[in-house]
Amino acid sequence: MQVLSSLKTAKQRHRDCQIVRRKGKVYVICKSNPRFKARQR
C-alpha cells in the first residue's frame, strides 16, 4: 500500500479504483488489482 499526499492520480490508475473513508483516513481500494491500494496521510 502506498502512502500518498494526494489521491488524485491514485483513483485514476484503474477503472475499478474507488475512494473510501475509514477512521478519518482516505483510502483507495481496488478489488480487481490490489496493488493499486493507497492511503492518504
Curated annotation (Swiss-Prot):
GO terms for molecular function: structural constituent of ribosome. GO terms for biological process: translation. Pfam families: Ribosomal_L36. GO terms for cellular component: ribonucleoprotein complex; ribosome. InterPro entries: Ribosomal_bL36, Ribosomal_bL36_sp, Ribosomal_L36_bact. Transmembrane segments: none annotated. Keywords: Ribonucleoprotein, Ribosomal protein. It comes from the Bacteria. Disulfide bonds: none annotated. NCBIfam families: PRK00831.1, rpmJ_bact. Belongs to the bacterial ribosomal protein bL36 family. This is Large ribosomal subunit protein bL36B. It comes from Neisseria meningitidis serogroup C (strain 053442).
